[in-house]
């Protein structure tokens, strides 16, 4: 089964380009952190990247070609390598203001295509870090005026053998 999304080429390029500084450098130990986590819910694609010390998030509008029976959209999470931003720039996504890309997500791969180009990226073979629970805890501490030390706990938990 695949899920297909449509997003403006410039939005897709800009999302990944803004995430690239927060992704980890190439590493045999942590290849998952070289990728950008993308989640689609309702009409928004949210990108998130971390190198264990920084966390970047941003979003852009997206149209899903698949929905549930009651009209709500199906949430889907997938990743793309941070280097996809370079691929998109090379193909002119950064300047294609009126062109849209189709993003097709399957269990094995993510395919990004336009009228003139098609890029396929393998699916991530490992779980992306569960930053949602860490962020929820951090936001709770911040609203209570407390200090946030989630980065240390996250690094210890994630890097534990």
Regions found by a protein language model. Give the residues of each.
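DNA polymerase processivity clamps
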Residues: 1-161
């Amino acid at each position: 089964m695949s899920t297909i999304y449509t997003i403006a080429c410039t939005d897709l390029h800009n999302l990944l380009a803004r995430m690239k500084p927060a992704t980890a450098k190439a590493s045999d130990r942590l290849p998952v952190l070289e990728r950008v986590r993308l989640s689609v819910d309702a009409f928004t694609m949210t990108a998130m990247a971390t190198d264990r010390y920084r966390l970047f998030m941003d979003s852009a509008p997206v149209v899903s070609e698949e929905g549930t029976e009651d009209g709500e959209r199906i949430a889907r999470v997938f990743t793309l390598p941070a280097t996809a931003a370079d691929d998109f720039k090379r193909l002119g996504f950064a300047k294609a203001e009126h062109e849209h890309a189709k993003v097709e997500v399957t269990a094995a791969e993510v395919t990004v295509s336009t009228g003139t180009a098609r890029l396929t990226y393998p699916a991530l073979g490992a779980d992306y870090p569960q930053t949602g629970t860490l962020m929820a805890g951090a936001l709770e501490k911040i609203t209570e005026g407390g200090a946030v030390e989630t980065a240390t706990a996250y690094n210890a938990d994630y890097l534990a053998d």
